[in-house]
Every structure is written in structure tokens, then in C-alpha cells.
Amino acid sequence: IARHMPFRIAAKNRYENDARARKVWDLCVRTLRYGAQEQIQDCMEREKGYYLGDGCYSMLAWCLLNGDFAPMRKFIDDFLRTSFINGGLVTCANCSFMQEIAEYPLMMFVLLPVLEERGDSREFVRERLGDFRKILDFYRENYAGDDGLLSNLDKWCVVEWPSQWRDGYDV
């Protein structure tokens, strides 16, 4: 027996007639259908909270597939609520695990235009713009270099490319 949030496919699979592409589509749909239980988690066996960075893309795909954007609004609010711990937000919400990854809160901005396009979410976005400005202010005040890039990070930074791919970027 499997339990999951209500999930109806609203998106069209344009590769319906391609057997290989259909397998990938089906895998992705099943992963999102059964992996989202009120929130997005990387690994159901070991993680007790959910990650902001991975959750942004999983939540976006989940909402676009089924047309229900209520979980995305909950996702955003859950992470905005962590600002009392750190103005740049924490990486993992709804749990006691304290972790900060610089890029993750900034990735959440990708969700705003998607919600803004939906007539029923415009007010939600407008009401939270001040909170999003505070995130930008936090990173500008604490980590912005003269070139506009994040620098002097004292937290984990996902963007730690191998030296041969850095193009002179100092991690």
C-alpha cells in the first residue's frame, strides 16, 4: 500500500509515443508522486527534514506536473520561517538539523515568477517580497564581493568546482 498527496497529471507528455522517453517520464512522475509527502525529501529513509535547494526543483516539477501550487506556497513559507535562525535562511526546514548552504536560499527566487504567472498566487508573492528582499540584503551585507559575487563564505558552498573548471574563481 502506498500513500501520497493527491496527485493528478495535468501536464502533457510530448514524448508519449517514444518508448524510451516514456520510461524516463514514468520514472520521474512516480518519483515525485511517491516522494512528496506534504514536503519534498531527498531520501525518505534517513532525512527528517527537507532541503531547500533540491526542494526548489523537485517542488517546481511536482507543481507543474499536477497543476497544484499549494505545496509550493507551503514550501516557501516553511523556509522563510527559518529566518529567525539566520537571515540567509537555513538549508533544511521542519527539523532540528542546522545547516546553511549559501546558494540554496537564492535558488528559491526561481519559484517567484512561476507563482506570479498564476493569478491565484500573485498576492502570495507580493506579501513575501519583503522577506525575499531581506534574504538579498543578508547576502549583500555579509558576503557580496566588489564584483557582485558571493565571497568570504563561512558556510558550506555548493559551488566548489574542481580547480581546472574554476576559470580563476576563488573558492
Q: Language-model features: where?
A:
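Extended, hydrophobic alpha-helical segments in both membrane/secreted and soluble proteins
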Residues: 104-115, 128, 132-136
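Active-site-adjacent bridging/hinge elements
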Residues: 2-4, 27-35, 78-88, 151-165
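Glycine-rich, acidic and aromatic/proline-enriched surface loops and short helix-turn segments
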Residues: 30, 34, 64-85, 138-141, ...
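Extended ligand-binding clefts on enzyme/binding-domain cores
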Residues: 45-66, 140-151
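Acidic/polar, glycine-enriched structural segments that form the non-catalytic walls/loops
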Residues: 1-52, 122-124, 129, 133-139
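Alpha-helical support elements that line or immediately flank enzyme active sites
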Residues: 52-82, 112-120
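The feature captures the catalytic groove of carbohydrate-active enzymes
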Residues: 86-108, 122, 140-171
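Aromatic- and histidine-enriched alpha-helix N-cap/loop-to-helix transition segments
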Residues: 49-56, 67, 99-107, 127, ...
